[in-house]
Amino acid sequence: MTDIAPTAPANLAWPDHFAVAHMPGSLPMGGVVPMTPIFAFREPAPRLALPRDHGLTPQRTDIELGGLIAFLISDVITQGEADAIVEASERFGYRDEAPGIQTPPGMRMNKAVHWVADEQTLGPIFDRIAHLLPHDMDGAQLYPALSRRINMYRYDAEDVFNPHTDGDWPGYGLTPDRRQMQEWAGLRSCFSMLLYLNGPEDGVQGGSTRLFRPDRGHEDVMPKKGSALFFRHGFGPRSVLHEGSRVFGEVSKYVARINVMYNFG
């Protein structure tokens, strides 16, 4: 993928960051850390200010899953934008526990950090792909913004996220004074958006996302830097069972889960 649109200079300073919320965080092999932080920058980060038009043409490819909904959108962000998001996440710091996530022992075997992004980051991303998203789900209308809460995962060597389904979530953003995370009223998510921030072109080995059909067949999606995989989630039969397959080698895989919101109010 060619980095067409100009990106903020890599030498721009990062703002300070701090915890805007704490939630119980589940550990990979069981147990809970009661006060697991969710982070934000104290002010918008210039390196995460994305242009509305990034010079690329996102394209949607539907994935056949026996009636379940899943699709891939290419060229969502540029290489430079992906690198900046990874760098931001490393500044917050990855940890074993994942806030607000409940998984049984041995299911989620990776590192996590959750943070709340600004409109200047996720607003342009939504604008680039909105025309490719389902605009009506079960009578609810697509909300014109992605949830600002980003759940990021780093897969080091031998890390895996064993088969699971994603629950639906409320949307989140920051309060006007940026001091706290705030839940959005009347909204629920219908799709997980897995934004791939690196891939085989960066030396990642393994790490495909395996999507299961109802007949237990499957489709494997290899991470491609800048592309995003979407699939239906929630607590019902239409939620897509999936797996973050094992990563091998010295290069870690980075992925961001972002929730696509619908207005049920």
Report the location of each language-model feature.
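Fe(II)/2-oxoglutarate oxygenase catalytic core
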Residues: 1-230, 234-265
